[in-house]
Amino acid sequence: VDLGFAKSHVDLIKEAMVGVTVEGTSRFVFAGAPYSSGGKTGTAQAVTIGQQDKYDADKLAEAQRDHSLYIAFAPAEAPQVALAVIVENAGFGSAHAAPIARRVFDYLLLGLYPSEEDIAAARKGLASTPIGQQRLASDVPLVRVADPTNNPPEPTASVAATSKASVATATAAE
């Protein structure tokens, strides 16, 4: 899709975003991912603090804490998925929003669902690189919502087949 920007400018931005996942603020979240991606972390203030004041989330009411932001695409060479994640009042983008993006990419690109340990860590705000044995998404019942037009997409059959091979290889390596 031509957005009217010079290709050299778009390529520079894409390269910088890939750098964020390789050596930048989300490098730990995407460590070991079998696909390349590009992303940008962000933090948005929910309230203004004084010029001389130091930000301390622990001293603020939850509704006053910074928002965690992350935009990303994958695979980097030929993007199939682009997303934006906003986690209200959660803090730094690399700590909360980027791990969610990793799980979405793993689901959509690899057909993998987080392990129970990973879900428990995420609920405590401790998510980073996936932990535990990821499960095939096809083995996890998909919870349907009341509005059937608002259900998440299921991975394609080719993704599921590739995922079974990836899980088998990862299990054999452990």
Regions found by a protein language model. Give the residues of each.
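Short, gly/Ser/Thr-rich active-site loops of penicillin-recognizing serine hydrolases
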Residues: 1, 98-170
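Active-site beta-strand/loop architecture of penicillin-binding DD-peptidases
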Residues: 1-2, 8-115
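Short, solvent-exposed mixed-charge patches
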Residues: 172-174
